[in-house]
Regions:
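Secondary-structure transition/capping residues
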Residues: 8, 25-28, 56, 149, ...
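Extracytoplasmic beta-strand-rich oligomerization domains located immediately C-terminal to a leader/signal peptide
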Residues: 13, 17-127
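Short linear sequence signals and composition-biased patches located at protein termini or domain-edge surfaces
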Residues: 135, 142-231
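Short, mixed charged/polar active-site loops
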Residues: 92-97, 128-131, 183-190
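N-terminal single-pass transmembrane signal-anchor helix
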Residues: 1-17
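Low-complexity, Gly/Pro-rich coil/beta segments used as flexible assembly/activation regions
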Residues: 56-91, 126, 133-167, 198, ...
Length: 231
């Protein structure tokens, strides 16, 4: 009887150790998967922001809009690469409006989703109802903008200049639960993105006629100064 009892204790100890290893491995895999999803979501946001486009003459089409809070979103027009998520759906239509939004998930919690629509086209029903899910179990999605017009320049969480691109955007994404701190997100990422473009003004977007070939009659009106030839 004593031997059987000792054997039972040994088996129980082995099982407990094995279960702890399996549970730790599962937790580690879940954490790694969550971190990878967060990196993919952040990279998608960065790629879209660095491809943003804006033309002042078409401000109604190229507006830049954002909102923070429980229904946070970020929407703008970008010229996207072929490797951008879901680009295959749109063929050669690489100039599209992208909207990143924080929405309730079907099961519970919230998720960060991406919708796209080619410029000058309405949103498709499929894109509206079945957006690309970039991240699940999102606790927070916030966006801030560098306001160069403020005195002094500073960060703001409200971008009211919808017909102008911000020069610098900071976004943060928090996901999951920290098992050691109840109520705290398990993963958080912060990125600073410098937009490599500015809003194109009408005079640049639609320049006037050039000087034409040599000997051609010049258009009426003041002419630009010509460089002096060699003396």
């Amino acid at each position: 009887m004593v031997a059987l009892a000792l054997l039972g204790l040994i088996v129980a100890a082995i099982y407990s150790s094995w279960y702890a290893i399996v549970r730790g491995s599962r937790t580690g895999l879940q954490a790694a998967a969550a971190a990878q999803r967060m990196r993919v979501a952040a990279r998608t946001l960065e790629e879209a922001l660095t491809s943003a486009r804006s033309y002042a003459a078409n401000a109604k089409l190229y507006y830049f809009a954002a909102e923070n809070g429980d229904k946070a979103y970020l929407s703008f027009v970008a010229r996207l690469s072929k490797s951008f998520p879901r680009s295959g759906r749109f063929g050669e239509l690489d100039v599209r409006r992208v909207t990143f939004s924080l929405e309730p998930a079907p099961d519970s919690g919230k998720q960060l989703v991406l919708r796209q629509s080619p410029l000058l086209m309405d949103w498709s029903q499929d894109e509206q109802e079945h957006p690309a899910v970039l991240a699940r179990d999102v606790k927070e999605f916030t966006v801030q903008f560098w306001d160069a017009h403020a005195t002094p320049p500073d960060w703001t969480d409200e971008w009211t200049q919808t017909n102008e691109l911000p020069s610098l955007v900071m976004f943060s994404l928090a996901m999951g639960e920290d098992p050691s701190h109840l109520g705290r997100a398990g993963h958080m990422i912060v990125r600073f993105v410098a937009l490599p473009t500015v809003t194109v003004q009408p005079g640049v977007q639609a320049p006037g006629p050039g000087p034409g070939p040599p000997g051609a009659p010049r258009p009426p009106g003041p002419q630009p100064a010509q460089p002096a030839g060699p003396s």
